[in-house]
Amino acid sequence: EELNKIGINYIQDALFLLPKKYENRTKLTSIKDLTPGEAFQFEGEILESKTIFPGRRSFMARISDGTGFLQIRLFYFSFAQAKAFKVGLHVRGYGVIRTNGSLLQVFHPSYKIFASSKRPVLDNTLTPIYSLGSTKLTQFRARNIIKECLKEIEELNLNEKEIDSIFKQQKISSLSVKDALLKIHSPSVEDDIIKINSYKHEAQERLIV
């Protein structure tokens, strides 16, 4: 039902839900190097976490990577979310950095919490962000759905003519439809992000008519 709200009824609908922008989560930035007003991926150990009263209820977690301190703030959160921020665990997040005096803060970042022995690997491609409107569908879920659809196209082993007949596209690029879809949903850090953001990348030209 949530997929229907954004016009996804078939595999090709999901594949042609093109990203509106991308985030670079292929690298980590030390807390001491975080710049206010810009988005970064950061990581640190949870030193403190608490729900703040009175006034507007909010949650705060303070983390450090050994180079500095960062405060994570949540204003809309569940009990389970707050409970997950256990002191001693580590968190990797992505969000726009703010300042409150000399204090570095980030509001509602996307994040993963993990034990130091189970540190997740960094992404090796740019992370796509999709227009999901007011649906309850999360970016994480949308990315997983599209990954599964890409796998299905790969496993069907269709040739270019068969894929073109499905999508009713005219060839306007040297890329195949399959390669264009893979590139547009998971571009490498070497891809020209300026061209991608202005819809002038060859993968987009292959798909957009």
Language model: regions and residue ranges:
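OB-fold nucleic-acid-binding modules
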Residues: 17-47
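Helix-hairpin-helix
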Residues: 1-9, 14
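Short, solvent-exposed coil/turn linker segments
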Residues: 10, 27-31, 176
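A common structural microfeature
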Residues: 11, 39-41, 69
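Upstream accessory/linker segments immediately N-terminal to the RecA-like ATPase cores of bacterial MutS
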Residues: 52-59, 64-209
